[in-house]
A protein has these predicted regions:
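Glycine-rich, basic loop-to-helix element that forms the pyrophosphate-binding segment
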Residues: 64-80
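Membrane-interface aromatic/basic loop that binds lipid-linked glycans or pyrophosphate carriers
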Residues: 271-332
């Protein structure tokens, strides 16, 4: 059996998938299988993968009806034969040494997981200026849940992402964890806190993963109501840490981040002219914001001005936003 299973799901990446597959096959670590999951895409990606599979026995192709990224990733989880799993998005590029580096860090540290840094490239593979790299303020061997301290305090998604990690597959299977198929965005991040609990991870800021941002891709769109999945994810994280007093500081940071992300999405929806379309989608998250408002106001060290804005927002979001516009303080 292979030591590592690499899961790559795809729907509409015909221009980039061959480059992604080539980068994986060029890895210096060779004891792996590559699972290509065709999520019922509209173009020839599935046929391309079948052709690629004929050129390298390490490639296994799975075709399925379209069900979203989480359902495709779960096909990979269920069929992986390796001791460790890695995920590579269908339009991204990994360094040849990524698998070797993360595997070595796991073996040397005794951690069941390892993670690296990532940066953003454009459609031609060139570095994109102005995009914050995915790095971590914590390095070396750490409590894996401490990655959420970094995520909540810096905004970096180094911790909650799957694509920059190599993970012992038993952390999924022994706990019965699968990706959340109700989530369109953040399907991997929405479950990793459960994978991390009670575990350690070795973190490095070596840039071994290159994330592609292209016009029209899910993550490049200015605002999409499906992004509100992130608020569900943040709420679940807050509830998770609320039940674990030993992580009280991370809980408080998570509360504050939930409010910041909610307000940011509200701002983006208004700026994109999508608020009328998104009003209904915001409703359950507004209820969560009201539910969390008491500890937010009491425990998170908000300034007097921020407390006033939160109280006004809870009373009348549109009015609070209009006042913020008059003051020139919209997105913070």
């Amino acid at each position: 059996m292979p030591e590592i299973s690499i899961i790559t799901t795809f729907y509409d990446a015909v221009d980039y998938l061959p480059l992604t597959v080539k980068a994986i096959l060029d890895s210096t670590f060779t004891d792996f299988e590559l699972l290509l999951i065709d999520d019922g895409g509209p173009n020839d990606c599935g046929k391309i993968c079948d052709i690629l599979a004929e050129t390298d026995p390490r490639i296994r192709v799975f075709h399925k009806k379209n069900g979203g990224p989480a359902s495709a990733a779960n096909v990979g989880l269920k069929n992986a034969r390796g001791r460790y799993i890695a995920t590579v998005d269908s339009d991204d590029i990994i360094e040849p040494t990524m698998l070797e580096t993360l595997y070595r860090q796991i073996q040397e540290s005794g951690c069941p997981m390892a993670a690296c840094a990532g940066d953003c490239i454009d459609g031609q593979g060139n570095p994109l200026p102005g995009y914050n790299p995915v790095v971590c303020s914590l390095t070396g061997k750490i409590d894996a849940l401490e990655l959420f301290r970094d995520a909540f305090s810096t905004g970096s998604f180094y911790g909650p992402l799957s694509w920059n990690k190599l993970i012992d597959i038993r952390l999924f299977r022994d706990r019965g964890i699968l990706y959340d198929e109700k989530m369109f965005y953040g399907d991997d991040a929405s479950v990793l806190h459960r994978v991390f609990e009670g575990q350690t991870i070795y973190c490095t800021n070596q840039f071994l993963y290159h994330y592609r941002s292209r016009q029209g891709s899910m993550t490049a769109l200015t605002f999409n109501p499906r992004k509100l999945d992130d608020l569900t994810m943040y709420y679940d994280w807050v509830q998770f840490f609320a039940a674990r007093p030993q992580y009280a500081e991370i809980y408080r940071l998570g509360l504050k981040r939930f409010w910041q992300v909610y307000y940011l999405f509200y701002h983006q929806a208004v700026q994109a002219g999508k608020m009328a379309d998104c009003h209904q989608a915001f409703a359950p998250h507004f209820e969560h914001l009201k539910e969390l408002s008491r500890p937010l106001l009491a425990q998170c060290g908000l300034s007097i001005g921020e407390k006033l804005r939160l109280r006004l927002f809870l009373f009348n979001p549109a009015l609070a936003y209009k006042l913020a516009r008059l003051r020139g303080n919209l997105s913070k």
